[in-house]
Amino acid sequence: MTFRLMQAALLLSLAGCSASPSQSADAPSIGRPFAVSEVAIFNSPWAMAFLPGSSAALVTEKPGRIWLVDIGSGSKQPVGGVPRVVVSSQGGLLDVKAAPDFTASRLVYLTYSEPSPNRGSGLALARAQLVRDGGGAKLSNVQVLWRDPAGGEGGQFGAIIAFAADNKSLFLSSGERQRFTPAQDPSQPLGKILHLTLDGKPAPGNPMAGRMGAPVVTITDPPRDTEAAKSAEGRQFRWPGPNLTPAETWSSGHRNPYGLAFDAEGRLWETEMGPRGGDELNLILPGKNYGWPLVSEGRNYDGVPIPPGSSRPDFVPPKLFWAPSISPSSLLIYDGKLFPQWKGSGFIGALSGEALVRVTFSGDSAQKADRWDMGSRIRWVGEGPDGGIYLLEDGTRARLLRLTPAKPSG
């Protein structure tokens, strides 16, 4: 861990972790201060990565496809060499990011649900080289850097990649796969934010650096996405080698973390889907526990209440929460020039909310600012090299949209 990251982590750890979460009014904003244009159409897209030094981007589709798209013309071509994925309601080909040194290395990072030798599928983090020759493109030398060896059934993979501010390590969100209890088990990678080297090893300076997990863990499979998961019978899984989960873990107690982004000061923010209500915006601190499934600002899908965060001051509460749910899908912290008034704002894609949500930050606090109705489920939000804000809709005929400043009326 670099001095800058260690310094930021120390300051954040000392900053009021026990503050109450904010749940202010969340009414839709009137009018849109941006124009919306369509760039291209995709089938079940999940994520997008702009490629430095070009007008090209990679778009993943959950069924196992990657497209190379020109964001200027909207033209696209398939990318070959994609690893095999297991497609389910929330599983398949998921996140994609260009490596920090992409211009020189041509490396990209992927997350996906891979076939498990035990049962179902497990989350995998892979790295590959993007090769372009003539009119084609393919992934070469695909290498799995990290995986959940236990596998199993269930959705909620998380699977979001964020490179550290110094570009020497990465953070990976790992959902709890609808099993509840692993989020509080230090020997299971589910329900965690992991901090890894660029080669997928435990990053130096992690809160539990050097610690090993239990060689045998209990897997709730099939999962129970209700309170019943806490008492469900499970199968025993023996780790195929040293269990490095504690050494990999940055934070714990997460449900389905779908957004990870650093602000300009090096703070790591996360958006997380709650159960029925209780979607969260969290400031991620090293070694902290965010409480799931023991506390939440929402309720279980079967209506069984969950104790609120205020009942457990030993857990870190969210900075913001949404009840009813908006189903946050992704997080962008804007740093472009096209919308100077929004520099430093957070933008959250909302699935069930069918909206683009804006939040503002002040140090380690956050405030709800705007919520624009988009009329469709927003799967992903990001910033383009032109400073435009780009959105991917969810679904089998989903548009890639570009947001630019609205022209003054009259």
Language model features with spans:
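Acidic, Gly/Ser/Thr-rich repeat motifs that build Ca2+-stabilized beta-propeller blades
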Residues: 17-181, 259-261, 267-274, 324-364, ...
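Amphipathic coiled-coil/heptad-repeat helices and related helical stalk/stem segments
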Residues: 41, 154, 253-254, 374
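Repeated scaffold domains used in trafficking and secretory/extracellular systems
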Residues: 378-380
